[in-house]
């Protein structure tokens, strides 16, 4: 039999482990106290990014995300052809001052984001990138980090989540290879499909989102998203998204953000709105 002294030591050890775990404030894999979340949108040429911006703004408005540090980036496209979908007004409504415009000024956006990333990494935090597009911008971030602070282990501290084969195929080959070698690159199932292990946020059916979203800011965000997506969907050779053309929704890129924050159990668009309904806050 174990002596009382050994039992006491084991009890104190277990208690200390429990206290350490419970003191770490996590949402899914994200440490609220240290980490930085980056939402990067190519916005070229599919208008699904526009719906995805509204979807991510909806998640960030939830009370559970109150202290999440985040930054969004517009125009993180790769080598694909086609026209850009301008959505600056939507970015401003959705993210306030927490976004950069890589389409208008790539170097300025890269500088702004690099500063945020370096600050987080130096303080021991991780970077979680939801890649709603290609990975060329992410490659530039990592190269900046390695040039400035080569001692930082980007493979351990920078996580890139990608759901789309198309996005990978339209990333410059050398940049895709680079991020896979120098970051924790995570490929999840396609967010356009229901029942494959990722939430399926593509639907050609209309979703009664107003039954769930009553917050005035979010109503404004979604209305602006629909306005922009409807204006540019298929316009001047841009991709014609069938879901958006039929009055449905496509915020499939949000599947990556759900994976990061532990909501990848959601099945479809309706379950998304049930989970993040304004009525729950």
For the regions a language model picked out, list residue spans one by one.
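N-terminal secretory signal peptides that target proteins for export/translocation
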Residues: 1-2
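Sec-dependent N-terminal signal peptides
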Residues: 5-14
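N-terminal acidic, glycine/proline-rich low-complexity segments
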Residues: 22-281
């Amino acid at each position: 039999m174990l002596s009382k002294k050994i039992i006491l030591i084991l009890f104190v050890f277990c208690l200390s482990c429990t206290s350490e775990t419970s003191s770490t404030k996590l949402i899914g894999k994200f440490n609220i106290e240290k980490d930085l979340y980056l939402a990067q949108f190519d916005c070229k040429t599919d208008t699904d990014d526009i719906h995805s911006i509204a979807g991510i703004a909806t998640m960030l408005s939830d009370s559970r995300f109150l202290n999440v540090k985040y930054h969004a980036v517009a125009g993180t496209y790769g080598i694909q052809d086609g026209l850009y979908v301008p959505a600056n007004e939507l970015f401003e409504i959705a993210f306030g001052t927490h976004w950069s415009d890589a389409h208008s000024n790539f170097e300025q956006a890269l500088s702004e984001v690099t500063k945020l990333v370096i600050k987080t990494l130096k303080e021991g935090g991780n970077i979680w990138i939801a890649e709603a597009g290609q990975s060329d911008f992410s490659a530039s971030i990592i190269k900046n980090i390695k040039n400035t602070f080569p001692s930082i282990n980007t493979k351990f501290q920078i996580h890139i989540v990608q759901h789309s084969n198309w996005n990978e195929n339209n990333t410059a080959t050398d940049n895709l290879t680079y991020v896979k070698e120098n970051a924790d690159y995570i490929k999840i199932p396609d967010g356009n499909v229901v029942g494959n292990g990722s939430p399926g946020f593509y639907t050609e059916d209309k979703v009664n989102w107003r039954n769930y979203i009553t917050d005035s800011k979010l109503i404004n965000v979604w209305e602006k998203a629909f306005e922009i997506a409807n204006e540019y969907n298929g316009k001047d050779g841009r991709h014609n998204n069938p879901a958006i053309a039929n009055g449905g929704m496509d915020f499939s890129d949000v599947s990556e953000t759900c994976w990061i924050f532990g909501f990848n159990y959601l099945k479809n668009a309706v379950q998304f709105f049930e989970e993040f309904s304004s009525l729950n806050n």
